[in-house]
């Protein structure tokens, strides 16, 4: 976990797009604990405002450095207002749609949201002189490589619209750096984020049917689904199931701290890509067994056919990030499953349903230490918050801005 410290050069203000999402919310918490000020923008399309409230509660006194605006990046006018109110030192860009299957069915939606939204963001950043960016890319840009470990030099051949949108944005970033060397950009290619904050109060809350393995496993464990369907058990792997590189979401969040520090400390970073993974492959069955051990629950299995296009084995070589960002994943599969189960057992139906009820003796939110559980604001948040897309909330009284948009 990130230690509390101030980044070189003093406290800096960072815009976090998609900061209410799974990875984004964990990154916002780590940013606050590392001494940054974080302003979250999110359209809440596939995320929950309750995640931001829980970040505030977990951040304690650091929550005074947190603000939220409900903004869709495709609404350039709303984004302009956010930049007009605050001077940002850098942007961490998570916002985007991320379901591979949905991207195949609705490619235009993905290009509009992921690409057009990013173009708006980059244009507004440039207009306001903010030219430091950490972009949430994906290992999906590699497609289905035949060999592993996967390095940053592997061919970029995404095989679905989601991965293609990530590559398009990467290409845009490389193009704008070539035309304007003042830009400093880091592209972080994640492998498979799993786990949850060790407190059990932040985690993945997928809307609808989960798109990834771990949330599906957790839903079976808490009784929301009868069984887990494994897509293929005839791969040339140690147990016949696909092998992937799973990374704890807190390790991933800390990778963003390391990337930001690199942007601030380096005079000539340019536009660089880094893999964020553990460098170790874990099979589907190994994940299931580790989760059963962590939860004490038996996961019923159904063996289904392979999914077209899935690689047998895909894991990272994170040596470049270890060397240049001074970052290395700390958590193993057992810790990932432990924290995932801690989250799932406290929040079996995600954020919404348990913020107003008690289950198994636990208050999913109130036990952190403060807030009301009736849908009103919580620790660090103003009772009279306006949700009009223009006001940070909880910070209007405790972190007013001066005329230049800085926090006091």
From Swiss-Prot:
<dbReference type="InterPro" id="IPR016040">
    <property type="entry name" value="NAD(P)-bd_dom"/>
</dbReference>
<keyword id="KW-0520">NAD</keyword>
<feature type="region of interest" description="Disordered">
    <location>
        <begin position="369"/>
        <end position="408"/>
    </location>
</feature>
<comment type="similarity">
    <text>Belongs to the NAD(P)-dependent epimerase/dehydratase family.</text>
</comment>
<keyword id="KW-0413">Isomerase</keyword>
<dbReference type="InterPro" id="IPR005886">
    <property type="entry name" value="UDP_G4E"/>
</dbReference>
<dbReference type="GO" id="GO:0003978">
    <property type="term" value="F:UDP-glucose 4-epimerase activity"/>
</dbReference>
<comment type="function">
    <text>Catalyzes the interconversion between UDP-glucose and UDP-galactose.</text>
</comment>
<keyword id="KW-0119">Carbohydrate metabolism</keyword>
<feature type="binding site">
    <location>
        <position position="138"/>
    </location>
    <ligand>
        <name>substrate</name>
    </ligand>
</feature>
<feature type="binding site">
    <location>
        <begin position="13"/>
        <end position="44"/>
    </location>
    <ligand>
        <name>NAD(+)</name>
    </ligand>
</feature>
<keyword id="KW-0299">Galactose metabolism</keyword>
<feature type="active site" description="Proton acceptor">
    <location>
        <position position="162"/>
    </location>
</feature>
<dbReference type="GO" id="GO:0006012">
    <property type="term" value="P:galactose metabolic process"/>
</dbReference>
<feature type="compositionally biased region" description="Polar residues">
    <location>
        <begin position="370"/>
        <end position="383"/>
    </location>
</feature>
<dbReference type="GO" id="GO:0005996">
    <property type="term" value="P:monosaccharide metabolic process"/>
</dbReference>
<dbReference type="GO" id="GO:0005829">
    <property type="term" value="C:cytosol"/>
</dbReference>
<dbReference type="Pfam" id="PF16363">
    <property type="entry name" value="GDP_Man_Dehyd"/>
</dbReference>
<comment type="pathway">
    <text>Carbohydrate metabolism; galactose metabolism.</text>
</comment>
<dbReference type="InterPro" id="IPR036291">
    <property type="entry name" value="NAD(P)-bd_dom_sf"/>
</dbReference>
<protein>
    <recommendedName>
        <fullName>UDP-glucose 4-epimerase 2</fullName>
        <ecNumber>5.1.3.2</ecNumber>
    </recommendedName>
</protein>
